[in-house]
Amino acid sequence: MMCKALVFAVLLLAVPLERADSRALRTPVDAIQFVEQFLEHYNDLLNIDDLENQTGDQLESPQPLSSGLKVAEYPKWVDVPSQNDNTWFRLLRGALANRKRALPDRAKRGWNRGCFGLKLDRIGSLSGLGC
């Protein structure tokens, strides 16, 4: 994903714009220097492969709890905090946990329409002639 963003940034900077007041880099040398500086600055970011390797390592080797808290103090659906969690890993895991849950079936079906549809059901309930 980061590679796609880098390719897009390089293509965006390399294509000269027709407008005179644009901020596009004028020469390919400037564009190459900019991309090199960009890569040097963001080279140390965590990528997807590192995240997968880190999650695989944590699943393979269980670590003892050093925080003094017992496992019984936590419900089964809550992860026990470990001290060596990477900040990126915690951030991504929290983002996945905070996703909206699936919509209930009622939201997918719409209003309860009853026997004869919504309008006729309201008329029937007022007059006592429901189904």
Curated annotation (Swiss-Prot):
<dbReference type="GO" id="GO:0007168">
    <property type="term" value="P:receptor guanylyl cyclase signaling pathway"/>
</dbReference>
<dbReference type="GO" id="GO:0005576">
    <property type="term" value="C:extracellular region"/>
</dbReference>
<dbReference type="Pfam" id="PF00212">
    <property type="entry name" value="ANP"/>
</dbReference>
<comment type="similarity">
    <text>Belongs to the natriuretic peptide family.</text>
</comment>
<dbReference type="InterPro" id="IPR030480">
    <property type="entry name" value="Natr_peptide_CS"/>
</dbReference>
<protein>
    <recommendedName>
        <fullName>C-type natriuretic peptide</fullName>
    </recommendedName>
</protein>
<feature type="propeptide">
    <location>
        <begin position="21"/>
        <end position="109"/>
    </location>
</feature>
<dbReference type="GO" id="GO:0006182">
    <property type="term" value="P:cGMP biosynthetic process"/>
</dbReference>
<keyword id="KW-1015">Disulfide bond</keyword>
<keyword id="KW-0372">Hormone</keyword>
<feature type="signal peptide">
    <location>
        <begin position="1"/>
        <end position="20"/>
    </location>
</feature>
<dbReference type="GO" id="GO:0097746">
    <property type="term" value="P:blood vessel diameter maintenance"/>
</dbReference>
<keyword id="KW-0732">Signal</keyword>
<dbReference type="InterPro" id="IPR002406">
    <property type="entry name" value="C_natriurtcpep"/>
</dbReference>
<keyword id="KW-0964">Secreted</keyword>
<keyword id="KW-0838">Vasoactive</keyword>
<comment type="function">
    <text>Hormone which plays a role in endochondral ossification through regulation of cartilaginous growth plate chondrocytes proliferation and differentiation. May also be vasoactive and natriuretic. May be important for freshwater adaptation.</text>
</comment>
<feature type="disulfide bond">
    <location>
        <begin position="115"/>
        <end position="131"/>
    </location>
</feature>
<keyword id="KW-0165">Cleavage on pair of basic residues</keyword>
<dbReference type="InterPro" id="IPR000663">
    <property type="entry name" value="Natr_peptide"/>
</dbReference>
<dbReference type="GO" id="GO:0005179">
    <property type="term" value="F:hormone activity"/>
</dbReference>
